[in-house]
Amino acid sequence: MTTFLKSLIFLQDSCLAFLSLMFHRGSSEDAAEALKKLETSINGARISFDTTWTREFRSLFIVPLFKCLVAFCLIISLLVFIEGIYMNLVVLYVKVFERKPEKVYRWEAMQEDIELGHETYPMVLVQIPMYNEKEVLQLSIGAACRLIWPLDRLIVQVLDDSTDQTIKELVNTECAKWESKGVNIKCERRDNRNGYKAGALKEGMKHNYVKLCNYVVIFDADFQPEPDYLQHSVPFLVHNPEVALVQARWRFMNANKCLMTRMQEMSLNYHFMAEQESGSTRHAFFSFNGTAGVWRMAAMEEAGGWHDRTTVEDMDLAVRAGLLGWKFVFLNDLTVKSELPSKFKAFRFQQHRWSCGPANLFRKMIMEIIRNKRVTIWKKLYLVYSFFFLRKIIVHCFTFIFYCVILPTSVFFPEVNIPAWSTFYIPSMITLCIVIATPRSFYLVIFWILFENVMSMHRTKGTFIGILERQRVNEWVVTEKLGDALKTKLLPRIGKPSNMFLERVNSKEIMVGIYILCCACYGLFFGNTLLYLYLFMQAVAFLISGVGFVGT
């Protein structure tokens, strides 16, 4: 009705001004005055019409849509919070009641028999996949060969996919050195790199001497186990025939390399403390971390061995074995030294694989999990909802969409109320639970939050690529170890090296940073909350990442 009346007034004023202009016989000043009235009437009507139309469209469509997005994010926030509290309660239960694996499962130290001697020890195969690992090959091979285990019951298998002839010779020299000391070490090579790591592991299992082994241990080239690793882990498999996997925790030797490695340490420590510990305690299932784990050969064979259909062959094998009813044991007290990516580009590629691969595996295995009849309905629910849907998909997307899109955009919608519990209290409690895993880094919590939000953009993109199976879904990342850092590059590497400055610039981070900065400025001048303080910090984090000033 208001629009209709304004239209009538506009027509009336326009007609009067036009008639006055056409038929008025006075001076030219009067004609100019009439023309001015006509122009004013038209401009006023245009502004009135535009304002009215915009407000109505905003109130009828934009605001309700934004409210729906906020409500959806609030629901997801509660689900993430409940999941986090549940995992931490399980960990607390383990600590308070001392429910360590040694008390839950049978464990007895391996001992020699007077008559049989070493025959009481099972045959163990140690696999070390590597690709042009010049800087760490001596460390990794040496650590594997120093494992305390009868030499006649241990086989060390170096799966060398190196393309550099010099590095191949170094591997041969190192293997020959340990062979001369009595270690049964084999160096196996392929004429192709099909399947990458999964392909190398699968090919390594085809050799005749592997059939003599009962268990297989996998160490990536930058992992250095302690000599007593097998003595702590293998007894769980020997005395518990229902156990298929024993996983050790990672310990990071270069965590103090830079601020980025410190924040990675916080995230991964929480992953092991909460996700792996709670999964092992409550469901006897968790994802194999791809290294520092001991597998039962029979379980691997029953599950179908290594598959290279995704970039997370370790998780693929774990899920298939879990669906067959096999149990997994996580040893929080058993640690293996490893390294963290210290370059931002390397870390981005790694996070892409770690987010894209699980999402793609979920797409491929969802129906297989639902139709499975060998595990309980609760374990299937845990796999579908908690393990995959919530932790591997929803968390990544929610973090970016809510904290980097919805919250910044909310400054333009003062009529939409976002409760404080969703923006402050719940995130604070979740963050506190995460920081507990790394107490020494408590003072870095603000930097960790901002950095995790930046990385959530890459994880969200990787998740969608995995779910939709787009072009980069099977992109494999080779991690070249440098002794104290990791250097990552794509395979194959095509073309000439580009400008170093351009390689440091990340346009996506810069664009998101500029948008959040604009929202922060708007909130500062026109908002009535302190949200702009967070937005300014988050914008700076995106912009710093955008120009490559992260990592070494």
From Swiss-Prot:
Residue spans crossing the bilayer: 62-82, 393-413, 430-450, 509-529, 530-550
Enzyme Commission designation: 2.4.1.32
Xref: CDD domains: CESA_CaSu_A2 (cd06437)
Membrane topology: Multi-pass membrane protein
GO molecular function: glucomannan 4-beta-mannosyltransferase activity
Cross-referenced Pfam families: Glyco_trans_2_3
Sequence positions that bind substrate: 220, 222
InterPro entries, sorted: Glyco_trans_2-like, Nucleotide-diphossugar_trans
The organism's place on the tree of life at top rank: Eukaryota
SUPFAM superfamilies: Nucleotide-diphospho-sugar transferases (SSF53448)
Catalytic activity: GDP-mannose + (glucomannan)n = GDP + (glucomannan)n+1
Family per similarity comment: Belongs to the glycosyltransferase 2 family. Plant cellulose synthase-like A subfamily.
Protein name from the UniProt record: Probable glucomannan 4-beta-mannosyltransferase 10
